[in-house]
């Protein structure tokens, strides 16, 4: 029996994909196949017995749409968000939070074993949140038209169709007030939202940042024009909101999916807000990269600091340092910290943040980490000058390239702390680092081994997980 599109089947969910989709097999009785035909089905949990409709068929697998839960899994819950199945963000809301933490632990462990070749690795339970709601300090809200007029909310999963929704349960409640004020302003003054297909209209997105420790708020309206009609009237409305610190415009007239343009026009306040992670204060502008979950960021950075094992005498490199978030955490406990980041504005923020916190033992470089570090290394004459005690890397999803990893090991640090947002590329890089035999001259050969691993849940209700890994130098006999 051939599996065809639009057919319905009863399946039991036996596993989860790395994206959190349930995996169920159409039974061998129906197909006459030894192992059954696997389907990937969103919004299902291991243990669910579900009626699913086939929506896409590949050679060896397919995709199904959940039609009905026949027997729910013990780990299944009703999503709190009324639009959870439409939204592309919180894909795991049908799963208990405890089960999500287990899923993320398994995901990291499986990747480290399968891709990284770390067969005996034991990964501890994911560090989660006591209250995993209202945790995001940043929202990018798209505007558009629907049958009811101006709409604002979020994109439906894997589309650019806007679902009108003022509230998001992982964002601060104050965002609702801000969105209502912007929509009301647009309706009163006939300011049209952006039409993505035609490239017409003005208001594209509202970027909202909230300082969880300071209570400060920044609102940046992204517009498809050089100016916003009646901008003063919008500013008057927004500054009445308690905590409003900065109001600005971002100019983006390109027909692109990229949200922010390069130019920012300030309407009110300093054009940034301040917030804290631990004891470190940061200045955050509209275009700054800053972790969106400040509570778990502190957990993540404290774990990275613990793995770094600093005593105050170490020279540390922080690669992909952003606005200096990890760098400044490290600088409080290190002799010297060097940071590298490709975005010039981020390095300006990093230098400003260091000065703001009185940390004069930092130095920041603009450029690609895979270019800056090798160039710096080649210009140093002695092994002592080239040496780093600890190197911290926090790369984008693609991980590190081999040139950078080779330079890192050539600097023979005692410890490497790898912070990753993608456990698959993490595993690939760990395999490279642990299999590479390095030479330290007359002191002999050495290699790196994985000492500790810790997953951290930065994005509850999604399939994403951050991981911190400690590698230590092991002298060869």
Predicted feature locations:
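Terminal RNA-binding accessory module
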Residues: 1-79, 83, 363-364, 371
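Rossmann-like S-adenosyl-L-methionine
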Residues: 2-6, 18, 22, 230-241, ...
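Short beta-strand elements
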Residues: 14, 134-145, 149-157, 208-210, ...
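Short, conserved phosphate/pyrophosphate- and ester-handling motifs at nucleotide-, phospho-/glycolipid
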Residues: 47, 171, 293
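Short, acidic/hydrophobic/Gly-rich beta-strand patch recurrent on exposed beta strands
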Residues: 22-28, 153-156, 220-222, 350
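Short, aliphatic-rich beta-strand segments
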Residues: 208, 215-224, 281-285, 390
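Extended interfacial segments that mediate partner engagement and assembly in macromolecular machines
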Residues: 67-79, 85-193, 228
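Short, solvent-exposed loop/turn elements at beta->coil junctions and helix N-caps
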Residues: 124-132, 196, 205, 209, ...
